[in-house]
Amino acid sequence: NCYIFNWGQEGQELLESANPGADFGLKMVLDIDQKEYIPFLQSTAAARIILHQQRSFPFLKDLGIYAMPGTETSIAVLEDQTQHLEAPYSSCTVDGSDIPVANIYSKFNSSYSIQSCLRSCFQEIMVKYCKCAYYLFPLLNGAHYCNNQEDPDWVPCYYNIWDTVSHREQCINMCQQPCNDSNYKMTISMADWPSAAAEDWIFHVLSYEKDTSLDITVNRDGIMRLNIYFEEFNYRSISESPTTNVVWLLSNLGGQFGFWMGGSVLCIIEFGE
């Protein structure tokens, strides 16, 4: 299961933190319910977490971090904002509209990112050469997901595309970084939770809250506590600026021209005298 907190979509009100610090952040108790795990499909028992901007698609598998059961995990967050210069100083994109790849994640009302562009590009190549779409990525318009009945050769075709360096380079060259981007730096600390002195009553309360009609027992192998908060409200802003623009270039050329032209005129006058 995947849950998004403070997504801000579909008219949902965004929640704001009043102050920095652990007392003013998000606090959760999670139960990963290992009894529901399917053998051979999942060998890791944990919750995977990612912090991202509103309207950015969360690529949890690639960018997430793990939180262990039986622990209290505190995540202190700092934000870095990066602003790149647009053309002609760089090849960054403002909103992805100038990228020759159709964003298959736009149907989720999500903004442009390099990850979404790379996956969209791969899906286009998959549909072009294998005649079907990869089942873990959203569908392109007019395409269908690969299946063994209609596309018996899709598996070797998929691995051939995945292992071909030229296809990856093609997508990397087309997918440019956004001109404005935000990253979240996380400081993570963990401690055993609950403590030996408190585990009896905590497990009893959590078992009761989970289901009052069934005899369900919560234990250390399935629960964890999460604290996510801003370390401080200040953020670091990294912005690019041109060392020389057209105005400065013309000004410098004019100054140099005037200096050397004036010196030349003086030399000619002195030589004439």
Curated annotation (Swiss-Prot):
Its main location: membrane. One of its GO terms (biological process) is multicellular organismal-level water homeostasis. Residues 1-245 are extracellular. The keyword DNA repair does not apply. Originally identified and characterized by its inhibition by the diuretic drug amiloride. Keywords: Cell membrane, Cytoplasmic vesicle, Disulfide bond, Ion channel, Ion transport, Membrane, Sodium, Sodium channel, Sodium transport, Transmembrane, Transmembrane helix, Transport. It is a multi-pass membrane protein. GO terms for cellular component: apical plasma membrane; cytoplasmic vesicle membrane; plasma membrane; sodium channel complex. Coiled coil: none annotated. PROSITE patterns: ASC (PS01206). Disulfide bonds join C92-C179, C117-C175, C121-C171, C130-C157, C132-C146. It is found in: Apical cell membrane; Cytoplasmic vesicle membrane. InterPro entries: ENaC (IPR001873), ENaC_chordates (IPR004724), ENaC_CS (IPR020903). The chain crosses the membrane at residues 246-273. NCBIfam families: ENaC. This is one of the three pore-forming subunits of the heterotrimeric epithelial sodium channel (ENaC), a critical regulator of sodium balance and fluid homeostasis. ENaC operates in epithelial tissues, where it mediates the electrodiffusion of sodium ions from extracellular fluid through the apical membrane of cells, with water following osmotically. It plays a key role in maintaining sodium homeostasis through electrogenic sodium reabsorption in the kidneys. Additionally, ENaC is essential for airway surface liquid homeostasis, which is crucial for proper mucus clearance. Component of the heterotrimeric epithelial sodium channel (ENaC) composed of an alpha/SCNN1A, a beta/SCNN1B and a gamma/SCNN1G subunit. This is Epithelial sodium channel subunit beta. The gene is SCNN1B.
